[in-house]
Amino acid sequence: MYKEINGKDKKNYLLQIAITIKVQDFLWDRKRETSPKYACLVNYDDVEGGGEDILVDADDNPNAFFCFFLRIILSMYEFMNSLTLCLFPLVKSSGGALEESFLSSFVVRIFTMSLAHCLMFS
């Protein structure tokens, strides 16, 4: 299942790859019992510039679980960032109340994190 990447075993270097690459997508397949419960599709760009998709699963390697939660964290961060920028811009055009804007964005981030937590584990 694990193939060689640049002469190195993918299983041993999976965590390092997962940190350095961009996690493109995660898959959660519950249709077949033989398929992994949690799987993560990541893209690895080698030195020559070519890219390849790697499918890693948490049943075979716990580092794939890290990829799965990394993707969730990145999604939540992007969502909170866009929500904060839409509702409460950090620098107001009126030229004042930076502290008020920062506090408002902090409250929105906490609310969004709580909402995402409830949706994830409900």
Curated annotation (Swiss-Prot):
It comes from the Eukaryota. Partially overlaps SET2. This is Putative uncharacterized protein YJL169W. It comes from Saccharomyces cerevisiae (strain ATCC 204508 / S288c) (Baker's yeast). The lineage of its organism: Eukaryota, Fungi, Dikarya, Ascomycota, Saccharomycotina.
